[in-house]
């Protein structure tokens, strides 16, 4: 029996779920507002609240833990990114670093006085193709 054991299940493998949540969390931190389906947003809210709590501590250990949870890759580039870097576009190296800096410098300081509930989920109309429940997840203004 699985009493009180919440698992995020959307019909994917656990590695795919981890990577998908890390990518969605990076997008949420970078843009502060994304549109997704309701089950993904509910799981993303749990992860985002934990990351903001880490960012409020603003220690080296918290930064390292955030880098690990966001699966930040500083030296691993895809073949497309390697071609861009060879061509002189060095912005491919800075995307994840910007996300970490924004998390700790902007979002961590914005929510210092707040004890929890850093995100909000706004429900939208269902998607036309498959009738999936759509929503917007965003960080609160303050």
UniProtKB/Swiss-Prot annotation:
Pfam family, one: Ribosomal_L17
InterPro entries: Ribosomal_bL17, Ribosomal_bL17_CS, Ribosomal_bL17_sf
Alphabetical list of SUPFAM superfamilies matching this protein: Prokaryotic ribosomal protein L17
The name this protein goes by in its record: Large ribosomal subunit protein bL17
PROSITE patterns: RIBOSOMAL_L17
Keywords annotated in UniProt: Ribonucleoprotein, Ribosomal protein
Keyword Ribonucleoprotein: yes
Species name: Chlamydia felis (strain Fe/C-56)
Superkingdom per UniProt: Bacteria
Subunit structure: Part of the 50S ribosomal subunit. Contacts protein L32.
The family this protein is said to belong to: Belongs to the bacterial ribosomal protein bL17 family.
Keyword Transmembrane helix on entry: no
Gene3D superfamilies listed in its UniProt record: Ribosomal protein L17
A GO term, aspect molecular function: structural constituent of ribosome
Gene Ontology cellular-component annotations: cytosolic large ribosomal subunit
One GO BP: translation
């Amino acid at each position: 029996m699985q009493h009180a054991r919440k698992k995020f299940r959307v019909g994917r493998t656990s590695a795919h779920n981890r990577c998908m949540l890390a990518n969605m969390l990076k997008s949420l931190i970078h843009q502060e507002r994304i549109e997704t389906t309701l089950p993904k947003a509910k799981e993303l809210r749990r992860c985002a609240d934990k990351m903001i709590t880490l960012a409020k501590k603003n220690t080296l250990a918290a930064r390292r833990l955030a880098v690990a949870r966001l699966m930040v890759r500083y030296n691993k580039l895809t073949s497309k990114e390697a071609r861009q870097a060879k061509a002189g576009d060095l912005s491919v190296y800075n995307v994840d670093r910007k996300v970490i800096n924004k998390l700790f410098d902007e979002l961590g300081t914005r929510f210092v006085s707040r004890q929890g509930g850093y995100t909000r989920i706004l429900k939208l109309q269902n998607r036309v193709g498959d009738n999936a429940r759509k929503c917007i997840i965003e960080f609160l203004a303050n």
